[in-house]
Amino acid sequence: MIIQNYWNSVWRNLMKRKGFSFINIFGLAVGMASALLIFTYVAFEFSFDKMHSKSERIYRVQSTFHEGEVLTDDWATSSFGYGSAMQENLAGIEDYTRVGCIIQPEQLVKYGELCLRENGIAYADPGFFRLFDFELLKGDRASCLSMPCQVVITERIARKYFRDEDPVGKILIFNSNMGKVSCEVTGVMKEMPSNSHIHYNFLLSYATLPKWVQEYWYKHEAYTYVLLDSPERKEEIERAFPQLAEKYKTEEALKNKTWGVRLEPLEKIHLNPQLGYEAELKGNHSAIIALIFGAIAILIIAWINYINLTVARSMERAKEVGVRRVVGAFPKQLVGQFLFEAFVMNLIAFIIALGLIELLLPSFNQLVGRTITFSVWFTEYWGGGVLLLFIVGIYISGYYPARALLRKKPIVLLKGKFQNSRSGENTRKILVIVQYTASMILLCSTLIVFAQLSYMRRQSLGVKTDQILVIKFPGPTEGMKTKMESMRRAIKKLPLASKVTCSGAVPSEEVAMFLSNHRAHDALKQNRLYEMLSCDPDYIDAYGLEVVVGRGFSEEYGDDVNKLVINETAARMLGYVDNDDAIGEEIAVETLGEPMQVIGVVKDYHQQALNKGYTGVMLFHKDKIEWIPQRYISVVMKPGDPSELVSQIGEIWNNYFADSSFDYFFLDQFYDRQYRQDEAFGVLMGGFTGLAIFISCLGLWVLVMFSCAVRTKEMGIRKVLGASRWNLFYQLGKGFFIPIIIAILIALPVAWGSMNAWLAHYPFRTELKVWFFLLPVVLMLLISFLTVAGQTIKVVYSKPARSLKYE
């Protein structure tokens, strides 16, 4: 009966002021949708790698190198020999697995007549399926990777190569720069979940690798995972490892460094900082935290909006509450009525919010590059968190308006004088201050995020990226070197091709090949790691690298195969104070018997995006270290139709490598993909900032409307007494602009401090300028002015006689 009475009251109030109810519910729904969408994304990001039953005890072994107390290198990868040596010599390691990626990123995979270029290929030992719970649809978890020349493939790959046939027992041929190997399919696994940092299409048995590689300590090209008997063992193992490493440092390379490890918890890998040689781009922890605060701010703004509008409207309901109290209604019953009304309003808003999320989720997934569903709500505590937020929202938005009315005596409520309460007015002003403080912080932050993105895009990269077509090398074939040179010359003759060069890496990616080098005549042999870029003599000119001292490679010099060109960072790492000092110096390069001579220094350029710092790079002739493979042909295009050039190169390709797929990309687009994460963050911040301002202004608009309604007669009297229109406008507006100005004064230092800390993560960043804060202030005041003016003008320009008849 009580619930029925509550429902009747709620329905009557909803229908009585439909416009008001729509604004209230819509503002709440938009705020909920925004916050829940962000919370869904956050839940997904925090769910990474938690699907494994032993995830809390699994750690990734990451390599660290120190010179004294200085950390010089920090990698996600580790040596091939770390896993077995750690289990044999260090206490607390129950099990381990290694995932080796020594071979080139792409290989040719053949089954019958079908031959395709594939990536996502790795070498895993039997421990892989002991540590990780990836679902194996076919095959035995204990033995599918136990012998040489075995391979486990994903369900998608099985359909791709074998259609409806049973793939188990079939033979796949893998062709890489280390030769051909035939592997028997011993298992089929389900696609690795999107919320896993591990994604492979082919897992070859670790025993397939050459024997010398399997326990080699001087190749840090494996991802090693250990299962600890207790998380408390982590620090103990990290402390003991440097002493263990001394037993295995038998070669000259990196002998002067302290070899260490950092055990990174599996569940934290995705949101911890991006390290060198990560398999995938990780999440951005600072951006996630910023989005959490943004979502909470939007939710608070929506709740405050609801409270302010409900309290503002309570002047109409004061007599209703007064009558109920006079006829015997208990305070608890009245609070229950308001809470029930808040429950209904929040429930309607929640349902609308779910509908909005369902509509927006596909576009949102495309923006953030994820595959997110509502299923994340049902993992661990996230579903409970959403429910708790819903309950808190009901309490906040229902309890305060009820208490605001119950504090007044029934006689005051029956007289309808509730609106004159100074304490209630002050409370609403405080809530407006909170709303606009949050909106102002979001607005300043969004502007600075876009300013940083613009800064990174406007800066000179020091390397050419536009008008360059990049073609991936084919899989290893007979007479590869001769064919590639013939094809390069053929492409160079095309009318739309300006320059053609071959290299082991292109701008936008890690060079990914590094060697431990030092000055040849350095008695201390201070080895440091340098990225080694294999290229032909045309590379420096084609990519527009600036030679600041010396010269680049040239076919005119017959001995350039034994020369090096280094960048400025490499020169400093070698200890040269002046770039000129490096010219003619000899460098001892790891794996080479004879030193190489420096013939030139190029200006530092951005091999990767500006969210990463400069690294020491050594460019060497492609014929010098042949085990470091060539991977790309870069074609600098002349003005014209790119598709025509692609078509012409495709024809040339088929003349030489008909069995390999012709894969290409445009370098500027490939380079820009590095900024997608930052751009997505900027778009999200911008979108939610706009919503926060919209909701705040929506609430302000209704508050002004009610204020004008209450003060209509007062304004009429002021007009009769000679007040000007500007004076009337001032009287009506000052009560709203003072809280907004206070909010701005609070928000500015908070925004400056938080965004200064955010920018500190970028090695190349914009400076905080005054207009980053002045422009949001002007925008906020202008939007607020228009919101207030829209309502107050009606009262200011109304006739006094009409105003005096009001009420």
Where are these regions (language model features)?
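Intracellular coupling helices
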Residues: 5-23, 27, 302-345, 407-418, ...
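Mid-to-C-terminal secondary-structure elements
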Residues: 125-137, 149-283, 486-677
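C-terminal transmembrane helical bundles of large multi-pass transporters
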Residues: 658-745, 755, 760, 797
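Small-residue-rich transmembrane alpha-helices
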Residues: 33, 37-40, 262, 266, ...
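Membrane-helix entry/capping segments
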Residues: 1-12, 16-20, 52, 242-295, ...
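Hydrophobic alpha-helical transmembrane segments of multi-pass inner-membrane transport and secretion
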Residues: 16-44, 282-319, 347, 427-452, ...
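Alpha-helical transmembrane segments
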Residues: 30-59, 360-369, 438-466, 483, ...
